[in-house]
Amino acid sequence: MKVRIALPRRLARALGRLYGALHATLRLEGLLPDGSRVTPSTYPFGREIFAFCERDAFALGGILGRARFTTLIAPGRDGDWATEVVTSLGGRVLRGATRRGGTRALAQLLRDLPGDDGPLALVVDGPLGPSGVAKGGAVVCAARTGRPLRPVGAAGRRAPVVGRSWSRLWLPLPFSRVVVVVGEPLPVPPALDRPGRERLAGELTRRLAEARRRALAEVDA
């Protein structure tokens, strides 16, 4: 039994190293709200919350690996592998999702974040979709921490979709150009009722779609 557990972990760590090597070949370009352009090495990472869709996770993981980031990963076998990969990139992982323990994981996240100066990266449409539709967890986190909540979208030229996942997860090709659009922070008040949370989740969904459209237009230009 120990061998069966250890082997996948070694493979996942190796995958993390390959993942980092892939990102080293990419031509990564960040597009900010004011139209200015940055590279991952010049982006001023801080105490912000990056909200993105699962489809962009492969494209963004290596970029976030340049910062000391924290993320939330759903339970399950896929989550186990993802945890090993994120850890190999230098990220900190808490396990949980919007279902089955997500409330507890979010509470732990909120307890741990005050002394953490690194960014928080949250997949907002998981664990089961629909793709591109934000849940309310990131909004709650922004309300309780006061951190800026930034919608992020990415696109790559001729990028293949991995498997048949609900999320349409895509993988950047080696040496390809990848554009990452970082949107304006979504204003989130510290006190939110359920209708307010749902309204802001809807606005976040709209902004994520806009970031995705901008990234696609830029990469195809």
Question: Which residue ranges define each predicted feature?
Answer:
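Catalytic core of membrane glycerolipid acyltransferases/transacylases, capturing the structured
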Residues: 46-101, 145, 162
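Catalytic-site beta-strand/loop segments enriched in glycine and acidic/polar residues
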Residues: 108-141, 145
